[in-house]
Amino acid sequence: MISTANNQRVIVVGGGLAGLAGTVRIAESGVPVDLFSLVPVKRSHSVCAQGGINACNDVARQQGYSEWEHFDETLYGGDFLQHQPPVYEMAHWAPKVIDLLDRMGVPFNRTAEGQRALRLFGGSLYKRTHFAGATTGQQLMYALDEQTRRYEAKGMVNKYEFWEFLRPLLDDQGRCVGIVAQDLRTMQIRSFRADAVVLATGGPGLVFGKSTNSVMCTGAAAARAYKAGVKYANPEFIQVHPTSIPGADKLRLMSESARGEGGRVWCPAVKDDAGNWKPHPEPGKDPRQLPESERWYFLEEKFPAYGNIVPRDIATREIFQVCKDGFGVGGGNMVYLDLTHKPAEELERKLGGIMEIYRKFVGDDPVEMPMKIFPGVHYSMGGLWTTYTPGPDYDKIKAGQMPVQTPASGHPWDPEKRPAAGMDPNASNNMMTNIPGLYAFGECNYQYHGGTRLGANALLSCIFDGLFCGRSVANFVAEHADDPASSKPAAIFDNGVDAEEKIQNNLISSSGDENPYAIARELGEIMTRECTVVKDREGLEKTLTKLDELRDRFSRISVADSGMFTNQNLSWARAVGDMIDLADPIARGSLEREESRGSHYRTDFLQRNDERFLKTTVATYNPSTRKADISWEDVEHGIVTPRVRDYSKGKAKAANNGSKPDDASNHHDKSTSNGPTGATDPKDGVRAARPEQAPHAGAGQTIGSTTEPNT
């Protein structure tokens, strides 16, 4: 328990899973928390998460799974762009996180024996995803909100709902000592002192216009921190989810859990005399009348080991390409996600949430009719730059001084005896930005997912950030007990309020001829077209030119409503300017990363280039140009050697001889896989193949179990 003399306290901005978990952990440490949220916390975007949360448990362990496997497949899925210590720590904390949530009362689905049920999810051949139907995010949110209200009742948490973060406040040494925020009901702007500030504000989906994100997910808070001096990392890595429902207002997610539970992706097609697939002559024909011979299960055909549960960037590009090649439903931009072969009772029990969404917004019943889906912008792997302190064993492993006993060498992975190669739990800088005292948790930081996030790792990373790194925040507060925010000059806070009121007055008094809603629409259109599924130099340069135009036009906007009570036009107009500023590093990072890695796919640079780009993109805001200056930071990969990412077969496999293969970056299993090829079994959607692993970077040992999972 930390003593908080001098009225020390912490501000958490964002009431989603990362914000609530952090609030609970910090309050538990004895530090009072002021919790700010645009909406009532139970309405935060985390409630929209559907599929599940990844972790190893005893049942998964019986398949041959382990925390090490979770760690490795997360790196492999992310194309090795993550710093490895944070991912290592997260994978080993995952079982504890699930146990804690279970004790909090989260209604996880159960097996007949009472064990927590597990489902398949993208990027893994093991069932290791815990779930609560298809409303997992909502159930986790409600559990953490109950714990937050427990501390609220004790006077340790004050909620400021319907308040918007405007800027961080820094003292003369550059330390964050508070924020300026605005009451969205009265439009009052005021300052708040804090000894540390946590941003847990989610992703920038609205930068792309339509997305699966809630309409409040503008990325404005991260943009304001970025413009205040926080670096922004890997902005070009934007995840486009392969299965969403197009809508006039936004996109609605059809969870990856549908594929994990046996859903099959296909398009109407016929084979020519040479056996090649061709677009169907009647692409709009009732899918229920199409025989199996006229259904192209293209993911299962191209990726036999993983089938429909390949990682999202791969599935998205394949769907995008078959539609571009004329195979889409009705000749358009949709394919089928088919669950009609599954029992109705099972679908309602495991996927009831998304079934209800599809019926409501489309009008068809997925039990009877294959769903029509198309990829949609979903998640940002990039975010505010953060740091951490690695555990004491990391440098020894990196230098080859501490061999790691892995499953492949005949040693079961024991999480209790694991090397301390993750993050130091006693450090005060875990997930701190380059501004001391300012932290970033959840989707608005960049640490865990690299080039592509594996499904069901998002909820884990959010809650892990809050629970593990919340302790770092409390430690930072304790370290600065002799220099509290309460002792800082009033001018710091008054000047911040004055600056924000000036920005607001300029917006209200602006009498230009530009409509901020039209600017936002054009921004979303070009960002979606040029900065998502496929990219090239011409399109990215066109985007940067368009951003210059939009930036100029934004200076001439007119806000329709000049009132000072619940003025949503004013709040939106300001966010549009921030979205333009955040779009710049996304496009600029995409242009300067001349390779294809994870979700970043350049048609003019099709290969991954580790020599030049096994690095973090770091964007720094330049106030004079209002654009990003791009630099590069080496990625820490001292535990697992990066290797080629190839989901057409199991994960890369090395000889089990205790030494590195000649080429640790490119060694694939050329032998015939034991058992089924991995195509979906209509009965249960289970894979029988297993992924193999590459050697440990420090000790040169083969890592990965030789045991086939019993699924």
Predicted regions and their residues:
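N-terminal Rossmann-like FAD-binding beta1-loop-alpha1 element of flavoenzymes
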Residues: R9-L35
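Glycine-rich FAD pyrophosphate-binding loop
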Residues: E28-A49
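Glycine-rich active-site loop/strand segments that organize a redox cofactor
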Residues: A55-M90
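Conserved redox-cofactor binding core of oxidoreductases
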Residues: V97, D102-Q188, R193, A200, ...
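An anion/pyrophosphate-binding glycine-rich loop and adjacent beta-alpha core
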Residues: R224, V230-D365, M369-K372, P403-R418, ...
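Long, amphipathic alpha-helical stalk/connector segments used for oligomerization, subunit docking
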Residues: F476-T566
